[in-house]
Regions:
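ABC-family P-loop ATPase nucleotide-binding domain
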Residues: 1-25, 236-248
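ABC family nucleotide-binding domain
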Residues: 14-230
Length: 248
């Protein structure tokens, strides 16, 4: 039986994430579009990795493979000891809730729930924490992102940057080892974007693995490791910072 328990160790090769010869083909009227072509990628625990590339390059498809939102046409996707590409839909939901925190560009907070309720929601879904501990944990996470004083407000009362901070707190609700951030600073001013970036840096220092998709060239140059995707393939590494220079 495929394990969907919390991933606390890497796989047999010591990596938290490993993609092996991942191919993704989308069928269309013309026959088929190859969005990913033989991707081999390994990411270790506590790494902060940026995924960069032009629109349509395949970077979003790559993230969908890692999160299990989509499945490869061929190849393997492993996170810890779990073959993500082999999970059933029910197993996928459980695995994702326990092992993965996702931060989107547009926050996606539920508008009718308070900030505190938005953060406790993943805990309620996965039942990973005792009921009596959930509120305390949510408040601690909001304190970490400097949003505890807004705990009982609705999202509409917050600025975009504040909502993104809440979204980060929510992504940490079940203490996942892996955080996926898809253009998390895309709609933020530079000062707020810097603060959000600093939060991700602190998470890797605490042992989390963070993968960030970004078009922000200045931000990409600050990420310790970047992976460039072009035409569905990984571009060979170039000197530090050079990967970001071609991103418009």
């Amino acid at each position: 039986m495929v394990s969907v328990d919390r991933q606390r160790a890497g796989n047999g090769n010591g990596h938290l994430i490993e993609l092996r010869q991942v191919v993704k083909v989308y069928e269309n009227a013309a026959g088929g579009f190859r969005a990913l072509n033989g991707i081999d990628l390994s990411i270790d625990r506590s790494e902060f990795v940026g995924i960069i590339g032009r629109s349509g390059s395949g970077k979003s498809t790559l993230m969908n493979m890692i999160t299990g939102i989509d499945r490869p046409t061929s190849g393997e996707v492993r996170v810890g000891d779990t073959p993500v590409h082999q999970l059933s839909e029910n197993q996928m939901a459980r695995w994702r809730g326990r092992n993965l925190g996702i931060v989107f560009q547009f926050f996606q907070l539920l508008p009718t729930l308070s900030v505190l309720e938005n953060v406790t929601l993943p805990m309620d879904f996965c039942r990973a924490w005792p009921l009596r501990e959930r509120r305390t944990r949510a408040l601690a996470l909001l304190e970490m992102v400097d949003m505890a004083e807004h705990a009982y407000k609705l999202p509409a009362a917050l600025s975009g940057g504040q909502q993104q901070r809440v979204a980060i707190a929510r992504s940490l609700a079940n203490d996942p080892p892996l955080i996926i951030a898809d253009e998390p600073t895309g709609n933020l001013d530079s000062k707020t974007a810097d603060a959000v970036f600093a939060l991700f840096e602190s998470l890797t220092a605490e042992g989390k693995t963070v993968i960030m998709v970004t078009h922000d060239t200045a931000l990409a140059q600050r990420i310790p490791r970047t992976v460039m995707i072009a035409d569905g393939e990984m571009v060979p590494p170039t000197p530090a910072g050079a990967e970001a220079e071609g991103q418009g």
